[in-house]
């Protein structure tokens, strides 16, 4: 399945920078928030096209939406999906995502 270049921006929302994600970077695994409708092959294709790297594997997590309350009104935060992408050794994605490091 070929994706249009306009669709690439919509699938990957942002990289995740947490303690766990930082530890995973040392193992050549990078964490991204992605569109909940995205599949593993779509995520792999997008990462390989945008960053020009070789993806070995992808693990995804569907995180639940959380209940939020403002005054007497109860609402929900939107649900989201997180992808942990494993790259081949020596791939230069870190320089693209974090140029200051």
Swiss-Prot record:
GO terms for biological process: translation. This is Large ribosomal subunit protein uL23. GO terms for cellular component: ribonucleoprotein complex; ribosome. Disulfide bonds: none annotated. One of the early assembly proteins it binds 23S rRNA. One of the proteins that surrounds the polypeptide exit tunnel on the outside of the ribosome. Forms the main docking site for trigger factor binding to the ribosome. It comes from the Bacteria. Part of the 50S ribosomal subunit. Contacts protein L29, and trigger factor when it is bound to the ribosome. Pfam families: Ribosomal_L23. The keyword Chloroplast does not apply. One of its GO terms (molecular function) is rRNA binding. Belongs to the universal ribosomal protein uL23 family. It comes from Trichodesmium erythraeum (strain IMS101). Keywords: Ribonucleoprotein, Ribosomal protein, RNA-binding, rRNA-binding.
């Amino acid at each position: 399945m070929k994706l249009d270049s306009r669709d690439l921006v919509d699938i990957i929302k942002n990289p995740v920078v947490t303690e766990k994600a930082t530890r995973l970077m040392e193992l050549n695994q990078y964490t991204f928030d992605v569109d909940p409708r995205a599949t593993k092959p779509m995520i792999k294709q997008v990462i390989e096209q945008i960053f020009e790297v070789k993806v070995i594997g992808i693990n995804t997590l569907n995180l639940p939406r959380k209940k939020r309350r403002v005054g007497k009104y109860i609402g929900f935060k939107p649900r989201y999906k997180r992808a942990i992408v494993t790259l081949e050794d020596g791939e230069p994605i870190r320089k693209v995502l974090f140029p200051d490091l």
